[in-house]
From Swiss-Prot:
Gene: Sirt5
Entry note: cofactor: Binds 1 zinc ion per subunit.
Chief location: mitochondrion
Stated family: Belongs to the sirtuin family. Class III subfamily.
Name of this chain's protein: NAD-dependent protein deacylase sirtuin-5, mitochondrial
GO cellular component: cytosol; mitochondrial inner membrane; mitochondrial intermembrane space; mitochondrial matrix; mitochondrion; nucleus
Boundaries of the annotated transit peptide in chain numbering: 1-36
Subunit: Monomer. Homodimer. Interacts with CPS1. Interacts with PCCA.
Active-site residues per Swiss-Prot or TrEMBL entry: 158
UniProt-annotated binding residues for substrate: 102, 105
One of the GO BP terms on file: negative regulation of cardiac muscle cell apoptotic process
InterPro entries the UniProt entry points to: DHS-like_NAD/FAD-binding_dom, NAD-dep_sirtuin_deacylases, Sirtuin, Sirtuin_cat_small_dom_sf, Sirtuin_class_III, Ssirtuin_cat_dom
UniProt KW keywords: Cytoplasm, Metal-binding, Mitochondrion, NAD, Nucleus, Transferase, Transit peptide, Zinc
């Protein structure tokens, strides 16, 4: 999996495009910490005092809703994993196959619901908003389950399955049609022996802007593409201001998102990882809570005894 290039930003330009900033003594302690704590009571103290919480979410959160990840053992659509299909080169070479893949993913999501992890995050955001506190979700997921759960402060850094972008005029539009075009009806079956449809390009999703008619593509960030600089600027601002960070259901291997939480930890801010297993970044964080996010997050984000509940 090739790291994604990153647009320069105040935090990220030094991390990914040049020399790393020298760490303060406090951040050096955090970055070399060998055994993060799993003490929920200690985390809850940090949570009670936090005024600006950033939650970085990945595929592990949605996997608990039954969303396919297309990664790791068994993570295939037909004979391919996501990194073989989610690329500009794959779309240029075979747009029919790529659209079949995304049509399948769109149709799967119509029957998926937010799980207790998504709901705990959304309920926490709403509750703390009434107390003058801020919760922001930065998600790598493209399934819109955070939206469906009720999250309002949401940065979908990799885009969404339910938006398209015209390859001719660049227009971005929401699209919840099922199927997205008639030619994809009944297509996209994931089994390895499925015959490829080879849909003619002129029958694939087309732009509906007046006078255009260009080929549409999913409005998602593919491997090898830059993230939207405007979204990265918002991410930069939220990470710089947060006083508590949660990393939930992410493997911490896809860049630039893999460096968001370590950058926060480097300035001494508490970071808590919620994941089924450890990751390459685990030892940089103050807390690590193993297990399903749908189990650990409701406890972690429940109302604290010090909260003003109206």
């Amino acid at each position: 999996m090739r790291p994604l290039p990153v647009a320069p930003g105040r935090l990220f330009s030094q991390l990914c495009c040049g020399p790393k900033p020298s760490a303060s003594p406090q951040s050096k302690i955090c970055l070399t910490m060998a055994r993060p704590s799993s003490n929920m009571a200690d985390f809850r103290k940090c949570f009670a005092n936090a005024k600006h919480i950033v939650i970085i979410s990945g595929a592990g959160v949605s996997a608990e809703s039954g969303v396919p990840t297309f990664r790791g053992t068994g993570g295939y659509w037909r004979k391919w994993q996501a990194q073989h299909l989610a690329t500009p080169l794959a779309f240029a070479h075979n747009p029919s196959q790529v659209w079949e893949f995304y049509h399948y993913r769109r149709e799967v999501m119509r029957n998926k619901e937010p799980n207790p992890g998504h709901l705990a995050i959304a309920q926490c955001e709403a509750r703390l908003r009434d107390q003058g506190r801020r919760v922001v979700v930065i998600t790598q997921n493209i399934d819109e389950l955070h939206r469906k759960a009720g999250t309002k402060n949401l940065l979908e850094i990799h885009g969404t399955l339910f938006k398209t972008r015209c390859t001719s005029c660049g227009n971005v539009a929401e699209n919840y049609k099922s199927p997205i075009c008639p030619a994809l009806l009944g297509k996209g079956a994931p089994e390895p022996d499925t015959q490829e449809s080879r849909i003619p390009v002129h029958k694939l999703p087309r732009c509906e802007e007046a006078g255009c008619g260009g080929l549409l593509r999913p409005h998602v960030v593919w491997f090898g593409e830059n993230l939207d600089p405007a979204i990265l600027k918002e991410v930069d601002r939220e990470l710089a201001r947060c006083d508590l960070c949660l990393v939930v259901g992410t493997s911490s291997v896809v860049y630039p998102a893999a460096m968001f939480a370590p950058q926060v930890a480097s300035r001494g801010v508490p970071v808590a990882e919620f994941n089924m297993e450890t990751t390459p970044a685990t030892n940089r964080f103050r807390f690590h809570f193993p297990g399903p996010c749908g189990v650990t997050l409701p406890e972690a984000l429940a109302p604290h005894e010090t909260e003003r509940i109206s």
